[in-house]
Structure formats: structure tokens, C-alpha cells
Amino acid sequence: MEGNCTAETTCHVTAVVRVPKYCNCFALCYEIPILWDDVLHRHEKLLFGGFTCNAGIELIVTKHCCLAEAQTWRVHCHCSNSLSLQCMASKHVVQKVIEDFIKGGAMNKKYMWYREFVNSSRPDEINYVGSIIFRNTHYIYFRLSFFRTVHKACMEAIKRCINPELGVVLKSTYNYWLVLKCKSCSLQNYCSLKNCAVWVRSVIVRVLKEVEKTPVVLHQTTSKAEERRQSALRQAMMHGRCRQIQNLCLVNLNAFLHF
């Protein structure tokens, strides 16, 4: 159903959305992937599903991309005619869904401890980025980054651990992602989020054990780069201190160069 924005596909920008700063944890990766099969209603998938892509929305990078400010993001469409009525109708439907979807990212500011807990003593190769809670489902995003020589083996190992009910592994424009799904979380329920964080760490432990069966060495420590990202996000979200997104960005060249 979903495509990727590459040179081989028909891809055009249909809308631009302004996203609050609580989603700027995703801005470090230049994109927010969206699981359209989950997010769109059945009739919306029938009408517009073929025009969506894993990339979801993509950050519009400017000279002044500051973590402490709301950012603008572009929405893609993959139909064959950007001037068709179907494309224009799709634009309004998809834009409304995205605007509702990103509201669920408020937890990234409200519960900043979640990222710090999940990423504690974990390798950068499987890095928790942020969360979206939408229609009673908590989407938990991990960026995947392995050396090219072991990338394929590691991705296959991760897929063996993840069934469709638990989550999905996908390739987007700038990164590879693992998106876990939790059905018991609530933005207002602190205890459920604590339980979710513990569950997520247990899932990642299983994933890491499977990945380590491949010829790869993972350092079970919080990287200095992740500590800098956490510090920058906390200063930006809580104190309004501006940090340039480009200086902290995370882009996986394996995905970006389509390896």
C-alpha cells in the first residue's frame, strides 16, 4: 500500500503543516513515519491509501531550525496527477488526519523521562526517538542504524522478534524504523506509561539478544551523542533554549541512499 519518496516514484508535496515543538524529537530525524494502515479509516484507505508513503511527513529544513520552536513539515502524495480532484481531496483528508495524529506527540514534552529511561544503557543502533498516542494506540518510535556490512542481517533479526500486533519495521526516506504499538497507554495516566516503558525495555532486550546473534558488537551504554540530544531536548522543551536541529540530526545513509 505504501511507497517511499524516491526518484523512481511519482512524489509531490500537497500540503505543509505547522507542528508544535513537542514533536521536535522527530525533527532530529527529519521525518515522522506514519503507519497509514492503522491511522486511516477503511474508506480512506480505499480512496487514498495508495498515495501515501512510509515517510509520513518530512521536516522543511531552513537556516534557523531551532528545537525550541514549532517547525513546518511537508506532506507527500504519490498519485500520478497532482491536479486531479482525487489528489486535492486526498490532500484535505490526509492533512486533517496528520493534524490530529501529531497532537498525540504532547507526551514527548510532558513525560521527558520516558526517552531517558528507555534509552538508558542502550546502544545508539536501536535508539528511541519519540512517541505518538493516537486513537488509543501508543506508537513508540525507534531509529535503527547499523553498519552497511551487517545491516541486512540485523534487520532480519529484528523482524523475527516483532509480530504485526507488536509493531512493524519499515524503511522511510531518511531512516529505518522500528515502531512498537501499545494499546494500554493514556496521555493522562502516568502509571500506565511507567508500565509501558518497562515493557518497551523488555522488548528491546529481546531484540538486542537476537541482533547479537549476528556478527555485530553493540555497546550497552548510553552514548555521548544520545546524552547531548536528551540535554538539548530538555533545555529546548522546558526552558526555551534554542539548539540548532542540524547540529544534532540523525540520518541513516543506508536509507537515504536507498541501500
From Swiss-Prot:
GO cellular component, one term: host cell cytoplasm
Keywords noted in UniProt: Early protein, Host cytoplasm, Host nucleus
Principal subcellular localisation of the protein: host cell
InterPro entries: Adenovirus_E4_30/34
Assembly mode: Interacts with E1B-55k.
Protein name, per record: Early E4 30 kDa protein
Function per UniProt: Plays a major role to prevent cellular inhibition of viral genome replication by nuclear bodies. Assembles an SCF-like E3 ubiquitin ligase complex based on the cellular proteins ELOB, ELOC, CUL5 and RBX1, in cooperation with viral E1B-55K. This viral RING-type ligase ubiquitinates cellular substrates prior to proteasomal degradation: p53/TP53, LIG4, MRE11-RAD50-NBS1 (MRN) complex, ITGA3, DAXX and BLM.
Superkingdom: Viruses
Similarity comment text for this entry: Belongs to the adenoviridae E4 30 to 34 kDa protein family.
Source species taxonomy: Viruses, Varidnaviria, Bamfordvirae, Preplasmiviricota, Tectiliviricetes
Locations listed in the record: Host nucleus; Host cytoplasm
Annotated signal peptide: none
